[in-house]
C-alpha cells in the first residue's frame, strides 16, 4: 500500500493577527497531538519574543495524526510560517515544502496586504488553497461578505469555506476534513536518488544543526552520507525523525513525501541554508530544487556596546545569534563617537529590532544602535563601482559619477476614506504612483514604487497613524535606480560625529538637516561652553542651532563700583569659555542617535 496516499503537507498563511497560530493550536489539540496539560497559547511560537510580540519569527513544523470517521488514518504535516514581510523568503521555502495552504481570513477585517502577498506566494508554488474564515464568534463578523471578497479579489472558490473560531474551537473538524479532501497527496519516487528541501534549520547545542526537510524523492535514514548542493559539503546523517512539535527520532528514516528533520553534526547554520537541496553523496540527483537564494541583507545598522569594555561580549553574542540566523551578517567597525562596534546587516526593520532586542535580553548587554541605512551602489568617475553600506565610507562628491538606490514596489491596502492621506504620504516619500484597484466599495489597493531608504525609517508608523491603524503594507524589492543623493554630516562644536552621518536625497537635504539640528538642540545637555550644532553637505553648512552655555554670574560680588571692573571680569570669563570650548568635549546622549530617525 502506498503510504503517500495518507500524507498531507500544508501550511497556514494569513495576515498578522488573523489567528494563524491560534488555529494551529486548535488543530494540534483536536488531533490529540498535545494533551490538554501541554497546551499553552501559541505552541509553535517557542521564542519568548515571539510570544510577547504575538508574531511568528521562525518557521515551525508539527505532525498531526487525524482519524476520519471511516477509520482511515491520515498524517497531516503542518508547517507554520512567519507572516511578516521581512521573512518573505522563509515563507516561500516553507510553502515549497507543501502541496496546499490554508488561507486564514479574519471575518471582521477581510483581506489585508499580507494575506494577498502570502496568497500569491502560495499560488506561485502551485499550492491548492483552502480558504478558512476565522473569528466568526465575534459580533462584528461578516462571513458572507468576506466569502464574496475572497472570490472577487483572489479568485478562489469560497462558497463552502469553513466558518471557524480558533479561540472557541468552533468547526475545527471541518478544517481537518477540508485538508484531507482538497489538498493533494504528495508525489515523488522512493527509489529515485534522494532529493530533499531544507525549509528551516536551527542550531541545537547537543545535536549541531537540525535541518527541517521535506523529502521530494528517495529516502534518508541514519548512516546515509548526504551532500548539500549549494556548498557541495558531505555529512553523515546521525538522526532522522518527525516533529510532534518536539523532536521524535525515527530509526527507519524518512521517505518521499514526508516532512521531518535530520541532524548530521553540522556546526553552523550557514552550511545548511534554508532553500538548499539535500541529496545522497553516493548517488546524487541531477539538479537541485529550484528557488534557492542566499539571504541578502537589505538594511544595515551599527551596533556598539555602551561600555567599550564589553566589545568582546557583544562579538560573542552576535556570533551565537548568527549560528541560528543565516541572514544576519556583521563586521567590526570603529566610530570616532562611539568607539568599537559592529556593522550588521538585516533582512528588514523587524529583523533588526528582533536581533537588537535579543542581544539586550538574552545576553544582558546595553547597546547603542545607529540609524539604519540601505545599500547604495556607487560608481566613481574612474569607472570603479562598489556597494556602500556605511555612509561614512562615501568618497568625496567630486569623485562620484552617480549613485543608485534600491527601490521597492509597495502595495498598500487602506479604507477608501484614507486614500488621499496615503497617496500624499507616498508622494512625500518620493513615491511613483503605479495603479489603484478597488477591492470592494470601502477598500482599495494602491501600488507605488518607493525608494527603500524612505521606508526604512518610519514609513510604517506614519502610515498607521494617518489611517488610524487600518492600512496594511507589503513590499518587495524591485531593483536599483539612479538618484541624486548627498551625504549629510552633523558637526558638534566643529567636529564631525560620524555615527550621525546619513545619505539623503539632494532635494530633502536642507529640510532633513534643519530638523535634525533642531532635534539635537533639545536633546544635547547644556555644557559650560556653547555648543554649535551644524548640518553640512560637503563643505557647505546648511543649518545651525546653538546650545547656550551655562554661566556663573561673575558680577555678583561687585556692588556699584566702576564699569571697567565689571568689564574686566566679563572679559576674563569670556576668555575662559573660549579656552574651554577649544579643549572641551561634547557629551552626546544615547537618545540622540535614535532621535535622528524620528525626524519628520
UniProtKB/Swiss-Prot annotation:
Membrane topology designation: Peripheral membrane protein
CDD domains, per database record: EF4_II (cd03699), EF4_III (cd16260), LepA (cd01890), lepA_C (cd03709)
Enzyme class, broadest EC rank: hydrolase
E.C. number: 3.6.5.n1
Keyword annotations of the record: Cell membrane, GTP-binding, Hydrolase, Membrane, Nucleotide-binding, Protein biosynthesis
Subcellular location: Cell membrane
GO cellular component labels: plasma membrane
GO molecular function: GTP binding; GTPase activity; ribosome binding; translation elongation factor activity
Biological processes per GO annotation: positive regulation of translation
tr-type G domain mapped to chain residues: 5-187
Family: Belongs to the TRAFAC class translation factor GTPase superfamily. Classic translation factor GTPase family. LepA subfamily.
Matches recorded under NCBIfam families: lepA (TIGR01393), small_GTP (TIGR00231)
Pfam families membership: EFG_C, GTP_EFTU, GTP_EFTU_D2, LepA_C
Identification of the protein by name: Elongation factor 4
Gene field: lepA
